[in-house]
Amino acid sequence: MSSPEIETLTQALAKLPGLGPRSARRAVLHLLKKREAALGPLLRALEAVNDKLTSCHVCGNVDTGDPCGICADPRRDARMLCVVEEVADLWALDRSRLFPGRFHVLGGRLSALEGIRPEDLSIDLLIGRIAAGGIDEVVLAMNATLEGQTTAHYIADRLESFPVRLTQLAHGLPVGGELDYLDEGTLAQALRARRPVS
């Protein structure tokens, strides 16, 4: 039987995506076995993340500054806005270095099954950014899932009255695929072949 501290750590790790109780227990045992090489650096990294990272009030990205480095970068094309579901999607697209504009993170996607409604996402903030003017194109970069496409259609309907070009990523993306898991070549092709939302 393990100590309460080990059980607490195991339960905390098991809440992370992709880790169940058995994987979490193996991770805890590894950290304890390699205490100086693994546990110390992990603790320092977690502390730094907790102390220094914040959510950008403009786009929802996670960074050390607010506004984030992308929103504050004058080299970014402020006329282009790419809307993504999660921060991981923003990072995946930004790694491709093909999108010259700025981003907007919704914080999820619409889902009747999970009870996620439009007011649960940062859609109103997105509408406000577009209503403020200066944006010529909005790229809807939702995942190719039912919920992702439902979210894209909802946003397209909300943006219908705005004078912006509305495009979405080409569907060379696999149906059911998530942006964070795609290679940069696939993402690059999807960005290049984006098309108007109909």
Curated annotation (Swiss-Prot):
Gene Ontology biological process terms, A to Z: DNA recombination; DNA repair
Pfam families from the UniProt entry: RecR_C, RecR_HhH, RecR_ZnF, Toprim_4
Entry GO MF terms: DNA binding; zinc ion binding
Zn finger (C4-type) location: 56-71
Keywords: DNA damage, DNA recombination, DNA repair, Metal-binding, Zinc, Zinc-finger
Domain of life: Bacteria
Toprim domain sequence ranges: 79-174
Family: Belongs to the RecR family.
PANTHER family the record matches: RECOMBINATION PROTEIN RECR
UniProt protein name: Recombination protein RecR
Species this protein is from: Rhizorhabdus wittichii (strain DSM 6014 / CCUG 31198 / JCM 15750 / NBRC 105917 / EY 4224 / RW1)
